[in-house]
Amino acid sequence: MEDAESTTKDPVDRVEKVTWRDLQDGSFTAELKKLICFAAPMAAVVITQSMLQIITMVIVGHLGRLSLASASFAISFCNVTGFSFIMGLSCALDTLSGQAYGAKLYRKLGVQAYTAMFCLTLVCLPLSLLWFNMGKLLVILGQDPSIAHEAGRFAAWLIPGLFAYAVLQPLTRYFKNQSLITPLLITSCVVFCLHVPLCWLLVYKSGLDHIGGALALSLSYWLYAIFLGSFMYFSSACSETRAPLTMEIFEGVREFIKYALPSAAMLCLEWWSYELIILLSGLLPNPQLETSVLSVCLQTLSMTYSIPLAIAAAASTRISNELGAGNSRAAHIVVYAAMSLAVVDALMVGTSLLAGKNLLGQVFSSDKNTIDYVAKMAPLVSISLILDSLQGVLSGVASGCGWQHIGAYINFGAFYLWGIPIAASLAFWVHLKGVGLWIGIIAGAVLQTLLLALVTGCINWENQAREARKRMAVAHESELTESELPF
């Protein structure tokens, strides 16, 4: 009698483990379809977003090797110190807003988005000062003075784009966490189509040269934020989740920071390890060639990583929604479906990259040495792509569960205690140069993927669903108890 009563009161579905038989009852296929319908347009969104930086590098790169190297350095530095940090902080919404939407606390999404914008804008103030003095800092760090000076000028013109990014990232997650991908898709495609001619005009016709690329990137980020903000304000699709600007946005600052800091640590520790490789390449003999080649490899990896990142975004959203709704079994099935998609994507894209390795360098540069070096690096980039596809989805699972702090510990150990030391040893002591740097990154990614897989296998999904419900009850100011949440 007591057990029956507790079962009625407990809104979380009880499931021991998802077995192979469970995956054959139609739930797996249905979840696979949901993920594909979410991830396919989301992949286009991620690709067009990442292509803004890549197109900028391509257009600037044809001005010459110095322009490509300085723009690469500037974008790498700005990614490390600004864009990655802002994106990482905003990832807190993957847990908070995703679970709030699953719990049908729709208005919380708008409030949380405004809270994130406020916090991220404040963060941009000290970061902009750092960017303004980037050229001097790079010289102090021992970088080539000519590259450092031009990179500093490029970064200064990217400062307006940083503030736009602080608005753009919460808006992106506001739409993503309620599975409204169409506004993101339309906006990203429009901005991309505008960015290409805008960047070309500012670089080649305005007399700004490579500085025009930075200005074009900043303007495109602002256009992106304005378009999404307008859709949020005017569209009827956002009527339930839209919230007015009130003092309530300041009440959620502490909760946002609680999840934002570990989210930022998780993302940044991985992102920074790749960017650190670019900075280390500037200390190698022939720094212009090494920096240009590794920057091309990193941008290629970023572009091809768009599909697994979209799958990870879909998995994170679906898991957080299901946990917020108390559906632990459905959340568990999402993991199997997402990993299946990631494996297929890794094999297809990795094979395609190897097949086109001789053409890859020509997209970014007309310098023969750069083109040949990029072709030599392509097999290593393919291995990185396969590993990133797997760990990307596993990281998405951690975000959906609110386990970003565990992901941060894993990324720190895998890259900074293992991968980066191996990279430095191979590059400077074994004299493998850029190849050695990338092998070290692969070693870190292998350990990262194994540890994330181990953690995912140990998740108790029933407990995760119960914790999500408790979190939503607290967010609802305890006006509703855990069992009274409006599912």
From Swiss-Prot:
Membrane topology type: Multi-pass membrane protein
Listed transmembrane segments: 35-55, 73-93, 122-142, 151-171, 184-204, 211-231, 264-284, 293-313, 330-350, 377-397, 412-432, 435-455
Alphabetized PANTHER family for the sequence: MULTIDRUG RESISTANCE PROTEIN
Compartments reported by the entry: Membrane
InterPro entries recorded: MATE_euk, MATE_fam
The organism of origin for this protein: Arabidopsis thaliana
Highest taxon of source: Eukaryota
GO biological process: xenobiotic detoxification by transmembrane export across the plasma membrane
UniProt-recorded name of the protein: Protein DETOXIFICATION 11
Family: Belongs to the multi antimicrobial extrusion (MATE) (TC 2.A.66.1) family.
Keywords: Membrane, Transmembrane, Transmembrane helix, Transport
GO molecular function: antiporter activity; xenobiotic transmembrane transporter activity
Disulphide bond pairs: none
GO CC annotation terms, alphabetical: membrane
Keyword Membrane: yes
KW Glycoprotein (keyword) present: no
